[in-house]
């Protein structure tokens, strides 16, 4: 016999399928509800313009890349990476691999090539154990790697949008971003669940 779902996982599934943004994404045949988070950020911060080059970290299942394609057009370029596989999206150059691995990072940088990137975006998150003392440091490690990517490829005056989980290390990370960008906002999109610790740091005007 199969194992029964725990009460917490059953509650999560119930909440997930009742989520209006999940239902809306399903109706519109979108990859995920994350599409709407980025749309809200774009409406307020205007990060994406036609012809831009964008790096998407933690891309699967593809909600953010799917959205950005609609904003940057045929002349734009998206280089996406995730440890999980992702179904192809026209206009997206996808690399499957663990971004923490030096060889995967080298392959990603090779895909970027000589181009300077206009926007680096990261929706990366670790597999959560339910223990904040374990989960928050893992999450902070990923967002530090995303910021390191900015330092390597982001064009002067470029932008960075990153999902961060509030907890130990958050304030220091925010301070570091403020030292590198001219304008920094912390956003909590409507499609982000209220009880989630996640927020999105939107940083523009990279000092280079």
Curated annotation (Swiss-Prot):
Q: Tell me yes or no: is Cell division among this UniProt entry's keywords.
A: no
Q: What is its EC number?
A: 2.1.1.166
Binding-site list for S-adenosyl-L-methionine: 62, 64, 82, 98, 123
Localization terms from the record? Cytoplasm
Which residue spans adopt a coiled-coil conformation according to this UniProt entry? none
Q: Name one GO molecular function term.
A: rRNA (uridine-2'-O-)-methyltransferase activity
Q: Which SUPFAM superfamilies match?
A: S-adenosyl-L-methionine-dependent methyltransferases
Instruction: Please name the top-level EC class of this enzyme.
Output: transferase
What InterPro entries does the database record attribute to this sequence? RNA_methyltr_RlmE (IPR050082), RNA_MeTrfase_FtsJ_dom (IPR002877), rRNA-MeTfrase_E (IPR015507), rRNA_MeTrfase_gammaproteobac (IPR004512), SAM-dependent_MTases_sf (IPR029063)
Instruction: Family membership, please give it.
Output: Belongs to the class I-like SAM-binding methyltransferase superfamily. RNA methyltransferase RlmE family.
Q: What is this protein called?
A: Ribosomal RNA large subunit methyltransferase E
């Amino acid at each position: 016999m199969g194992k029964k779902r725990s009460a917490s996982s059953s509650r999560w599934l119930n909440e997930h399928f009742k989520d209006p943004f999940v239902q809306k994404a399903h109706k519109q045949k979108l990859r995920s509800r994350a599409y709407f988070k980025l749309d809200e950020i774009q409406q307020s911060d205007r990060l994406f313009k036609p012809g831009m080059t964008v790096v998407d970290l933690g891309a699967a299942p593809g909600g953010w890349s799917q959205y950005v394609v609609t904003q940057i057009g045929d002349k734009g370029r998206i280089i996406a990476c995730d440890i999980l596989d992702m179904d192809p999206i026209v206009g997206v150059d996808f690399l499957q691999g663990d971004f923490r691995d030096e060889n995967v990072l080298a392959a990603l940088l090779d895909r970027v090539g000589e181009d300077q990137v206009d926007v680096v975006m990261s929706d990366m998150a670790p597999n959560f154990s339910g223990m904040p003392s374990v989960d928050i440091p893992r999450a902070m490690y990923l967002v530090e790697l995303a910021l390191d990517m900015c330092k390597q490829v982001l064009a002067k005056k470029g932008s960075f949008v990153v999902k961060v989980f509030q907890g130990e290390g958050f304030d220091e990370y925010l301070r570091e971003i403020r030292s590198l960008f001219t304008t920094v906002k912390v956003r909590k999109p409507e499609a982000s669940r209220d009880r989630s610790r996640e927020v999105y740091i939107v940083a523009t005007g990279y000092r280079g």
